[in-house]
Amino acid sequence: MKAVYLCLCMLAAFCFSAAALPADCSQVIVGSADGWNSSHVQLSLLEKGPRGWVMVKGPFPARLGKSGLVWGRGVSMPPSGGPVKKEGDLRSPAGIFELGGVYGTVPVPQKKRSMPYRRITPRDMWVDDPASPLYNQHFVLKHDPVTPWEFKQQMKLNDYAHSLKLFIRHNAASGREKPVPGAGSSIFFHIWRRDGGAPTAGCTAMSEENLRAMIAWLDPSQHPLYILLPAMEYLRLRGAWGLP
Protein backbone atom coordinates (compact mmCIF):
# COMPACT_ATOMS: atom_id res chain seq x y z
CA MET A 1 0.00 0.00 0.00
CA LYS A 2 2.84 2.38 0.87
CA ALA A 3 4.50 1.57 -2.46
CA VAL A 4 1.34 2.57 -4.36
CA TYR A 5 1.07 5.77 -2.33
CA LEU A 6 4.72 6.57 -3.03
CA CYS A 7 4.21 6.12 -6.78
CA LEU A 8 1.17 8.43 -6.77
CA CYS A 9 3.09 11.13 -4.89
CA MET A 10 6.08 10.89 -7.22
CA LEU A 11 3.91 11.08 -10.33
CA ALA A 12 2.07 14.11 -8.97
CA ALA A 13 5.38 15.76 -8.08
CA PHE A 14 6.22 16.16 -11.76
CA CYS A 15 3.10 18.32 -12.09
CA PHE A 16 4.05 20.47 -9.10
CA SER A 17 4.58 24.09 -10.14
CA ALA A 18 8.06 25.49 -9.57
CA ALA A 19 6.97 29.07 -10.26
CA ALA A 20 9.24 31.78 -8.89
CA LEU A 21 8.91 32.67 -5.23
CA PRO A 22 7.19 36.01 -4.48
CA ALA A 23 9.53 38.91 -5.23
CA ASP A 24 9.23 40.25 -1.67
CA CYS A 25 10.16 36.91 -0.07
CA SER A 26 13.65 37.05 1.43
CA GLN A 27 13.37 34.46 4.21
CA VAL A 28 12.68 30.76 3.65
CA ILE A 29 12.53 27.76 5.95
CA VAL A 30 13.39 24.67 3.90
CA GLY A 31 12.30 21.25 5.11
CA SER A 32 14.05 18.40 3.30
CA ALA A 33 12.42 15.11 4.29
CA ASP A 34 13.91 11.65 3.95
CA GLY A 35 10.98 10.56 1.75
CA TRP A 36 7.20 10.68 1.32
CA ASN A 37 6.66 8.05 4.02
CA SER A 38 9.26 9.36 6.47
CA SER A 39 8.63 11.38 9.63
CA HIS A 40 12.22 12.69 9.67
CA VAL A 41 13.22 16.04 8.15
CA GLN A 42 16.17 18.43 8.10
CA LEU A 43 15.36 22.14 8.42
CA SER A 44 17.46 25.04 7.11
CA LEU A 45 16.90 28.78 7.48
CA LEU A 46 17.77 30.73 4.33
CA GLU A 47 17.93 34.48 3.81
CA LYS A 48 18.26 36.45 0.58
CA GLY A 49 21.01 39.06 0.47
CA PRO A 50 22.80 41.11 -2.21
CA ARG A 51 24.57 37.99 -3.48
CA GLY A 52 21.57 35.69 -3.37
CA TRP A 53 20.35 33.11 -0.88
CA VAL A 54 22.57 32.06 2.02
CA MET A 55 22.01 29.61 4.86
CA VAL A 56 21.89 31.34 8.24
CA LYS A 57 21.12 28.26 10.35
CA GLY A 58 20.99 24.52 9.81
CA PRO A 59 20.47 21.96 8.73
CA PHE A 60 19.03 20.72 12.02
CA PRO A 61 16.72 17.76 12.71
CA ALA A 62 12.95 17.92 13.12
CA ARG A 63 10.03 15.50 13.06
CA LEU A 64 6.97 15.31 10.81
CA GLY A 65 3.69 13.41 10.85
CA LYS A 66 3.84 9.75 11.83
CA SER A 67 2.83 8.63 8.32
CA GLY A 68 5.10 11.05 6.43
CA LEU A 69 4.13 13.66 3.85
CA VAL A 70 1.21 14.41 1.53
CA TRP A 71 0.43 17.37 -0.73
CA GLY A 72 -1.03 20.37 1.14
CA ARG A 73 -2.83 23.60 0.30
CA GLY A 74 -0.70 26.73 0.59
CA VAL A 75 0.94 29.22 -1.76
CA SER A 76 1.14 26.23 -4.07
CA MET A 77 -1.95 24.14 -4.71
CA PRO A 78 -1.76 20.31 -4.72
CA PRO A 79 -0.79 18.80 -8.10
CA SER A 80 -3.73 17.36 -10.04
CA GLY A 81 -4.31 13.69 -9.31
CA GLY A 82 -1.95 13.46 -6.35
CA PRO A 83 -2.82 12.38 -2.80
CA VAL A 84 -3.84 15.38 -0.68
CA LYS A 85 -3.89 16.20 3.02
CA LYS A 86 -6.96 15.03 4.97
CA GLU A 87 -7.98 15.60 8.57
CA GLY A 88 -6.52 12.93 10.83
CA ASP A 89 -4.27 11.24 8.24
CA LEU A 90 -1.13 11.75 10.39
CA ARG A 91 0.75 13.27 7.44
CA SER A 92 2.48 16.65 7.19
CA PRO A 93 1.43 18.87 4.27
CA ALA A 94 4.08 19.24 1.54
CA GLY A 95 4.41 22.34 -0.64
CA ILE A 96 5.03 26.05 -0.08
CA PHE A 97 3.32 27.82 2.82
CA GLU A 98 3.07 31.27 4.33
CA LEU A 99 3.42 31.61 8.09
CA GLY A 100 0.90 32.89 10.60
CA GLY A 101 1.25 34.03 14.17
CA VAL A 102 3.06 32.66 17.20
CA TYR A 103 1.02 31.21 20.06
CA GLY A 104 2.17 30.05 23.45
CA THR A 105 1.90 29.81 27.20
CA VAL A 106 5.44 31.12 27.72
CA PRO A 107 6.86 34.61 27.12
CA VAL A 108 8.55 35.34 23.79
CA PRO A 109 11.02 38.23 23.50
CA GLN A 110 9.69 40.80 21.04
CA LYS A 111 11.86 42.82 18.68
CA LYS A 112 10.98 45.69 16.36
CA ARG A 113 9.85 43.31 13.61
CA SER A 114 8.51 40.14 15.18
CA MET A 115 5.91 37.62 14.12
CA PRO A 116 2.65 38.48 15.94
CA TYR A 117 2.40 36.69 19.29
CA ARG A 118 -0.64 35.71 21.37
CA ARG A 119 -0.49 34.33 24.89
CA ILE A 120 -2.91 31.38 25.01
CA THR A 121 -5.74 31.52 27.56
CA PRO A 122 -8.42 28.94 28.45
CA ARG A 123 -10.74 30.74 26.02
CA ASP A 124 -8.49 30.35 22.98
CA MET A 125 -9.87 27.85 20.46
CA TRP A 126 -8.45 26.31 17.27
CA VAL A 127 -11.15 24.40 15.43
CA ASP A 128 -10.49 20.94 13.97
CA ASP A 129 -14.18 20.14 13.44
CA PRO A 130 -14.81 20.05 9.64
CA ALA A 131 -18.52 20.70 10.23
CA SER A 132 -17.83 24.06 11.86
CA PRO A 133 -17.79 27.33 9.86
CA LEU A 134 -14.69 28.18 11.93
CA TYR A 135 -12.75 25.09 10.79
CA ASN A 136 -8.97 25.59 10.98
CA GLN A 137 -9.35 29.05 12.48
CA HIS A 138 -8.43 30.64 15.79
CA PHE A 139 -11.10 32.36 17.82
CA VAL A 140 -11.62 33.44 21.41
CA LEU A 141 -14.69 32.48 23.43
CA LYS A 142 -16.52 35.23 25.28
CA HIS A 143 -16.82 32.89 28.25
CA ASP A 144 -14.87 30.03 29.79
CA PRO A 145 -15.39 26.73 27.92
CA VAL A 146 -18.42 24.75 29.09
CA THR A 147 -19.48 22.23 26.46
CA PRO A 148 -17.56 19.10 25.40
CA TRP A 149 -17.14 20.66 21.92
CA GLU A 150 -15.55 23.79 23.37
CA PHE A 151 -13.15 21.77 25.50
CA LYS A 152 -12.18 19.68 22.47
CA GLN A 153 -11.37 22.78 20.40
CA GLN A 154 -9.44 24.44 23.23
CA MET A 155 -5.79 25.20 22.43
CA LYS A 156 -3.43 23.12 24.57
CA LEU A 157 -2.50 24.81 27.85
CA ASN A 158 -0.59 22.20 29.88
CA ASP A 159 1.43 20.49 27.16
CA TYR A 160 5.13 21.37 26.95
CA ALA A 161 5.28 20.45 23.25
CA HIS A 162 2.62 23.09 22.54
CA SER A 163 3.84 25.74 24.96
CA LEU A 164 5.27 27.61 21.96
CA LYS A 165 4.19 27.21 18.35
CA LEU A 166 4.04 28.99 15.01
CA PHE A 167 1.13 28.55 12.61
CA ILE A 168 1.89 27.05 9.18
CA ARG A 169 -0.77 28.42 6.83
CA HIS A 170 -1.90 25.12 5.31
CA ASN A 171 -5.56 25.23 4.23
CA ALA A 172 -5.87 28.62 5.91
CA ALA A 173 -8.47 31.36 5.49
CA SER A 174 -7.28 34.13 3.17
CA GLY A 175 -9.49 37.02 2.11
CA ARG A 176 -12.71 35.48 0.82
CA GLU A 177 -11.14 32.03 0.63
CA LYS A 178 -12.16 29.75 3.48
CA PRO A 179 -10.45 26.55 4.61
CA VAL A 180 -11.66 23.45 2.78
CA PRO A 181 -13.58 21.28 5.29
CA GLY A 182 -11.67 18.10 6.06
CA ALA A 183 -8.50 19.16 4.21
CA GLY A 184 -6.44 19.38 7.39
CA SER A 185 -6.21 21.79 10.30
CA SER A 186 -4.00 22.98 13.15
CA ILE A 187 -0.63 22.61 11.42
CA PHE A 188 2.14 24.27 13.43
CA PHE A 189 5.84 24.36 14.11
CA HIS A 190 6.13 23.31 17.76
CA ILE A 191 8.47 21.69 20.29
CA TRP A 192 9.15 18.01 19.73
CA ARG A 193 8.37 15.18 22.14
CA ARG A 194 10.89 12.80 23.75
CA ASP A 195 13.78 14.90 22.43
CA GLY A 196 12.82 14.05 18.87
CA GLY A 197 12.03 10.42 19.56
CA ALA A 198 8.37 10.76 18.59
CA PRO A 199 6.68 11.81 15.32
CA THR A 200 3.79 14.30 15.19
CA ALA A 201 0.19 14.13 14.01
CA GLY A 202 1.06 16.36 11.02
CA CYS A 203 2.98 19.33 12.44
CA THR A 204 6.72 20.03 12.17
CA ALA A 205 8.40 19.66 15.57
CA MET A 206 11.92 20.51 16.73
CA SER A 207 13.90 21.29 19.86
CA GLU A 208 12.80 24.30 21.89
CA GLU A 209 16.20 25.91 21.31
CA ASN A 210 15.86 25.69 17.52
CA LEU A 211 12.21 26.77 17.57
CA ARG A 212 13.01 29.87 19.63
CA ALA A 213 15.95 30.74 17.36
CA MET A 214 13.77 30.34 14.28
CA ILE A 215 10.97 32.51 15.66
CA ALA A 216 13.46 35.19 16.74
CA TRP A 217 14.97 35.21 13.23
CA LEU A 218 11.70 35.52 11.34
CA ASP A 219 10.76 38.98 10.09
CA PRO A 220 7.20 39.38 8.74
CA SER A 221 8.34 42.26 6.48
CA GLN A 222 10.49 39.74 4.59
CA HIS A 223 7.47 37.58 3.66
CA PRO A 224 8.89 34.34 5.11
CA LEU A 225 7.79 31.03 3.57
CA TYR A 226 8.05 27.35 4.51
CA ILE A 227 9.00 24.91 1.75
CA LEU A 228 8.50 21.28 2.77
CA LEU A 229 9.32 18.51 0.28
CA PRO A 230 11.07 15.16 0.10
CA ALA A 231 14.79 15.72 -0.49
CA MET A 232 14.74 14.41 -4.06
CA GLU A 233 11.89 16.78 -5.00
CA TYR A 234 13.60 19.77 -3.39
CA LEU A 235 16.83 19.02 -5.26
CA ARG A 236 14.86 18.88 -8.52
CA LEU A 237 13.05 22.19 -7.94
CA ARG A 238 15.49 24.38 -6.00
CA GLY A 239 17.15 25.74 -9.14
CA ALA A 240 13.88 27.29 -10.33
CA TRP A 241 13.67 29.13 -7.00
CA GLY A 242 17.34 30.12 -6.98
CA LEU A 243 17.83 28.34 -3.65
CA PRO A 244 20.99 26.50 -2.58
How would you label these PLM feature ranges?
Residues 1-4:
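Positively charged n-region of N-terminal signal peptides that target proteins for export
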Residues 19-201, 209-244:
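Cell wall/extracellular polymer interaction/catalysis modules
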Residues 206:
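A conserved hydrophobic position in a structured secondary element of the catalytic/binding core
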Residues 7-15:
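Bacterial N-terminal signal peptides
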